[in-house]
Amino acid sequence: MSGKVTTHVLDTSCGKPAAGVVVELWRIVEGGESELLTKAVTNQDGRLDKPLLTENKMARGVYELRFQVGDYFLRNGFVNQAYPFLHVIPVRFGLEDVNEHYHVPLLVAPGGYSTYRGS
């Protein structure tokens, strides 16, 4: 199995994929500092066109996905306030085995979200 980190975003308020969500992948380094590894935007299926991280760049450690959902909700008219309740959703996770597929989906609505380790 080739290791990689992937995600997808579903908008549970309308039951559709969330297109146009900016997703950042950060590595948490010594002292708790964050290092931006990559940034991508979800496509019409709410998925990314390629993995955020692949086997040759994977390393054991702590990572954080940051989903820029506030801009998505504003752009699509789901909220009508300058400062949406959910703006950036951070999901911090541990990566132990560089040969595994780490899929971290986000189910989101303007008032809440959930995530899980997918396959």
Curated annotation (Swiss-Prot):
One of its GO terms (molecular function) is hydroxyisourate hydrolase activity. SUPFAM superfamilies: Transthyretin (synonym: prealbumin). It is an enzyme of class 3 (hydrolase). Coiled coil: none annotated. It comes from the Bacteria. Its EC number is 3.5.2.17. HIU hydrolysis also occurs spontaneously, but more slowly. Catalyzes the hydrolysis of 5-hydroxyisourate (HIU) to 2-oxo-4-hydroxy-4-carboxy-5-ureidoimidazoline (OHCU). Belongs to the transthyretin family. 5-hydroxyisourate hydrolase subfamily. Homotetramer. This is 5-hydroxyisourate hydrolase.
